[in-house]
Amino acid sequence: MARKEGLAAALVLGPAGVMWRAFLSTVAAILALSAGSAAKADGDDAPIPAAQVCDRTPGLWDEAAEANTISLYALEWTPFGPAEMGWEAYAPLIQQEVGSPCDPVSPGFAEALATFQARFGLTASGRFDQATFQVLRGLWQERRPFVMARVRGECPAPPPIADLAYLTTGEEHAERLTRLLRRDVLEAYREMAAAARAEVPDIAADPELLRIFSSFRDPEADAARCAREGNCDGLRRAACSPHRTGTAVDLYVGHLHGLAVDSTDPHSRRYMSQTPAYRWLVKNAGRFGFVPYVYEPWHWEWVGR
């Protein structure tokens, strides 16, 4: 992974950038072929990797898979404003949405993506593109009642204090202590965290994982803070925050050394999206009534079951 990221980072503007892009495209294709060859070289008795199983239709989706192999790391785009390279940070959610366990660089994933594209009136190419992402993003946002309220020009009122409950010390992340959450949401969170630890050894081995570092935030205190910091309407904090509802939680899913647990740096978000905690949430949080905010791997909102 570091080798691929290093190549992506080497891209520059101008004629040299064009050459680097061509070079990266070639290398990405070679890496994909090498991975397949290595898997087959393990012998007939070796377990079949998921990506190899997803190569069940040889030839049909190979070109789309090759294009996805390149764009996964090299796509230059601005889906949320700041420039980003590649779409790896969003891959787990995309895999979940299109109903494919296949590696994003496999023909099987391309086939599933094409089926999704056709269902929503897009060109069924099997290639990830920005038009497809906009449809995906719309679906994810529509599942967040808070977002739909904001679209209507509403700012949801905070819950009565009697509906809030205190987190225990073991549920709070040390970097940012929080205190309150709506009672029914806290119960759902506890069930979810317990299930994650029971099902995933890596999560059970690290007591910090899935601890909460932001929950209910009093609207008046939040407004004063955003005014003081001059960051009221950016991606990181809004004047009308979903945390005012008592249904939003920021969960620790891991972080890069030297960066905050809620860093929006592209490298940070890409790292978080590949952690066992985040991948488990993508597949299972819905069982407990939680939906994600795609831009922030740590942010989840309870919408009921």
Predicted feature residues:
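Acidic helix/loop microenvironments that form the catalytic cleft of cell-wall polysaccharide enzymes
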Residues: V105-F120, E220, V294-R305
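Short, solvent-exposed loop/turn and secondary-structure capping segments
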Residues: S125, V147-M148, A224-R228, D262-T264
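N-terminal secretory signal peptides that target proteins for export/translocation
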Residues: M1-M19
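Extracytoplasmic/secreted envelope proteins and their assembly/folding machinery
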Residues: A110-L113, F133, L186-A193, L210, ...
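Short, conserved phosphate/pyrophosphate- and ester-handling motifs at nucleotide-, phospho-/glycolipid
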Residues: D129, D218, H243
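Extended, low-complexity, intrinsically disordered C-terminal regulatory tails
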Residues: R197-G230
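Catalytic cores and adjacent binding grooves of peptidoglycan-active enzymes
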Residues: C232-R305
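Cell-envelope/ECM-targeting effectors and their regulatory/trafficking segments
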Residues: W20-T26, I30, S34-I203
